[in-house]
Amino acid sequence: MAVLYAGRPVQKCERSRLMFNIDQPDSAPDNEDHDGDVVMHGQGSFFGRRKGHKLRAHQADLIENLLPHLSLQIDSPAPEPLTTLFDPPVEHMRLEIGFGGGEHLIAEALAHPDTGFIGAEPYVNGMAKILARIEAENIRNIRLFAGDASELLAWVPAGSLARIDLIHPDPWPKRRHWKRRFVQDATVAAMARALTPHGEFRFVCDIDGYTAWTLAHLLRAPCFDWLAQRADDWRKPWPNYTMTRYGRKAEREGRRANYLRFERL
């Protein structure tokens, strides 16, 4: 589909190269260290930090006592339909990958009480923060997963998710670490399997290199269509978007996020 860029019609692949320099390598210096320890687990390929600041007493208590009640166990088959994870069953299911402090996930869960949400986050401090919000606001439509989101995608039944959100993921700027980025051909295919027809994958990132990377992977995926029709569609947040703490930090530091929406065909 052609859209307008600088007053002339361009195809989506051409536009993505114009806007995000898809064919150019990332400009981050190779000696830039990533903040945190690198870990792997299970049969997947998760890389990232597991724990940062020491947990406060109440946070530790939530991890020990509340998390087991909300945590998904993927060593047994997923329920079908997936909506029966909740009692009573919800109407739709959504997934947020790497929810950080949980600001966006909490806001979405409160705004859509008839939708069930799965939040995947291996970072213990982020898990403790969202557990505190869940407890304080008595939120009943969130389940949590502390492992590799690619394993979770393989676990859910095909066509069971109405939407997947990936908001300000770790960009892994060094070229030798690009294979650690969540968006890969294999995970794009896994998301396509998990999403219902006309479901959406939404991606927010303030690093143009990773935005370009994501566009390149999604534009070559036959099961997805980029929904942008004009520049503001990726330059501005979608309606009712909840800015995360990391998003506000990026704005303070002068980095503008891009907001991408892809439809599962």
UniProtKB/Swiss-Prot annotation:
Catalytic activity: guanosine(46) in tRNA + S-adenosyl-L-methionine = N(7)-methylguanosine(46) in tRNA + S-adenosyl-L-homocysteine
One GO CC annotation: tRNA methyltransferase complex
SUPFAM superfamilies: S-adenosyl-L-methionine-dependent methyltransferases
UniProt-listed Enzyme Commission number(s): 2.1.1.33
Active site residues per record: D170
Residues binding substrate: K174, D206
Family note: Belongs to the class I-like SAM-binding methyltransferase superfamily. TrmB family.
Protein name: tRNA (guanine-N(7)-)-methyltransferase
